[in-house]
Amino acid sequence: MLANSASVRILIKGGKVVNDDCTHEADVYIENGIIQQVGRELMIPGGAKVIDATGKLVIPGGIDTSTHFHQTFMNATCVDDFYHGTKAALVGGTTMIIGHVLPDKETSLVDAYEKCRGLADPKVCCDYALHVGITWWAPKVKAEMETLVREKGVNSFQMFMTYKDLYMLRDSELYQVLHACKDIGAIARVHAENGELVAEGAKEALDLGITGPEGIEISRPEELEAEATHRVITIANRTHCPIYLVNVSSISAGDVIAAAKMQGKVVLAETTTAHATLTGLHYYHQDWSHAAAYVTVPPLRLDTNTSTYLMSLLANDTLNIVASDHRPFTTKQKAMGKEDFTKIPHGVSGVQDRMSVIWERGVVGGKMDENRFVAVTSSNAAKLLNLYPRKGRIIPGADADVVVWDPEATKTISASTQVQGGDFNLYENMRCHGVPLVTISRGRVVYENGVFMCAEGTGKFCPLRSFPDTVYKKLVQREKTLKVRGVDRTPYLGDVAVVVHPGKKEMGTPLADTPTRPVTRHGGMRDLHESSFSLSGSQIDDHVPKRASARILAPPGGRSSGIW
């Protein structure tokens, strides 16, 4: 659909408007790409397209905070470019995506960002923004982070505690990056797994002859995720930087996050559709291609209670957002690791299915209501990205990114009918309640009743502002009230000890009665020939008369009777 949004008038009539905090019956009038009115018996100009939403929900368009379109990773390029990926998003009810820029080590962040913009701008069908990965650390990287925030509309950076020798940062580097994020008001996204132990676990599995996809689950147990999660929360707390954990996959990591929030630490967290709905039993499937299709990191967990638990954490706000982490590869690409599971490209599809699957397992499953569904799929992301209430809410003045959602309609997911790329679907044959009937992006109907009507390049890049209130407002206040200060005291005016050995470890001047001896001449090893101990010559007890022997009548412990 090439028509300019300024010339389109739309009236959504008879529906129930759902925001993250309330639901009410209202009509919605859209013009010039903006929601102009919300209410009953609206006075609107003529010529508007009327969409009957009777019995339907009118919700904010979804915001998918983690997608990887046109990205090369582990020697394979994701099968979806920005056109096909954003098209699939719109068909599924998502109207904004956040992509990833992943620079190689020792390369420019700004150059990688500009390259990604060059790939995306001519292709996108919906609004988008970009995270930038921090894969190495140097003063130049810090300067480029400032440039990206100040001039390029970036407000989030992603770090990895895994992918050793590729993207992994050491703790000291994480500390510096988090300090930099806090100073410029950016969101620090962290993939938390203990990369050192993951690498050792992979070696051990391969040594045992385990080469199949199950090696992913075996080498990355949930305790490695929990440990890294606790560690990075600690580092973030020391730097007073808000932390955003991504791809949370386990009960253990969820418990660490819940405990940190209870302690008042500023922690946000995101899980994925796959982790919140599937299990790692698929890695043990007899069909190698089936098992490999589910390879993602952290891996899906064997404990069948995990997905239900993560959905509960989404419902109670321990986890704030659910993303697709969409990065599909074909079976042929996955087969690059047929002899070695460490070479299977990590990634699964899901940008098209995210909304319906979460509705089915979350709302229909009784874990959350329609308002919480809007929060985890749209509103919370908008708040974190500093876009709320321009996006993520149905109110006058907001962007006209709107979905007419039918909670009663059903669909059966299948790779044969999907718009997103790849030759496999994780949710094959899943029957979902909750279907987007109409998707409106930037005030234009782009999808209606199964028909897609949008040309590539009609989406726009959304610059993101730094210091989002949802995380930084409380931290700024904390720094004012809890600022560390030194003690005001009278200066010390007494004597100061002189350093005995300049250039070596400082130590006080020895007292006069402190026994000393010359420094050894043999590299720290004691030379017995230099010992001051002697068995000859004058001794302090020479004046005491010596006896050949002495009989002890009452030895310690009392007398004893002789046996012999």
Swiss-Prot record:
<keyword id="KW-0963">Cytoplasm</keyword>
<dbReference type="GO" id="GO:0005829">
    <property type="term" value="C:cytosol"/>
</dbReference>
<keyword id="KW-0225">Disease variant</keyword>
<dbReference type="GO" id="GO:0007411">
    <property type="term" value="P:axon guidance"/>
</dbReference>
<feature type="modified residue" description="Phosphothreonine">
    <location>
        <position position="509"/>
    </location>
</feature>
<dbReference type="InterPro" id="IPR006680">
    <property type="entry name" value="Amidohydro-rel"/>
</dbReference>
<dbReference type="GO" id="GO:0032991">
    <property type="term" value="C:protein-containing complex"/>
</dbReference>
<dbReference type="InterPro" id="IPR011778">
    <property type="entry name" value="Hydantoinase/dihydroPyrase"/>
</dbReference>
<dbReference type="GO" id="GO:0030425">
    <property type="term" value="C:dendrite"/>
</dbReference>
<dbReference type="GO" id="GO:0050774">
    <property type="term" value="P:negative regulation of dendrite morphogenesis"/>
</dbReference>
<feature type="modified residue" description="Phosphothreonine">
    <location>
        <position position="514"/>
    </location>
</feature>
<comment type="similarity">
    <text>Belongs to the metallo-dependent hydrolases superfamily. Hydantoinase/dihydropyrimidinase family.</text>
</comment>
<dbReference type="InterPro" id="IPR032466">
    <property type="entry name" value="Metal_Hydrolase"/>
</dbReference>
<comment type="function">
    <text>Involved in the negative regulation of dendrite outgrowth.</text>
</comment>
<dbReference type="GO" id="GO:0007165">
    <property type="term" value="P:signal transduction"/>
</dbReference>
<dbReference type="GO" id="GO:0043025">
    <property type="term" value="C:neuronal cell body"/>
</dbReference>
<keyword id="KW-0488">Methylation</keyword>
<dbReference type="InterPro" id="IPR050378">
    <property type="entry name" value="Metallo-dep_Hydrolases_sf"/>
</dbReference>
<protein>
    <recommendedName>
        <fullName>Dihydropyrimidinase-related protein 5</fullName>
    </recommendedName>
</protein>
<keyword id="KW-0597">Phosphoprotein</keyword>
<feature type="modified residue" description="Omega-N-methylarginine">
    <location>
        <position position="559"/>
    </location>
</feature>
<dbReference type="InterPro" id="IPR011059">
    <property type="entry name" value="Metal-dep_hydrolase_composite"/>
</dbReference>
<feature type="modified residue" description="Phosphoserine">
    <location>
        <position position="532"/>
    </location>
</feature>
<comment type="subunit">
    <text>Homotetramer, and heterotetramer with other DPYS-like proteins. Interacts with DPYSL2, DPYSL3 and DPYSL4. Interacts with MAP2 and TUBB3.</text>
</comment>
<dbReference type="GO" id="GO:0098978">
    <property type="term" value="C:glutamatergic synapse"/>
</dbReference>
<dbReference type="Pfam" id="PF01979">
    <property type="entry name" value="Amidohydro_1"/>
</dbReference>
<feature type="modified residue" description="Phosphoserine">
    <location>
        <position position="538"/>
    </location>
</feature>
<dbReference type="GO" id="GO:0007399">
    <property type="term" value="P:nervous system development"/>
</dbReference>
<dbReference type="GO" id="GO:0016812">
    <property type="term" value="F:hydrolase activity, acting on carbon-nitrogen (but not peptide) bonds, in cyclic amides"/>
</dbReference>
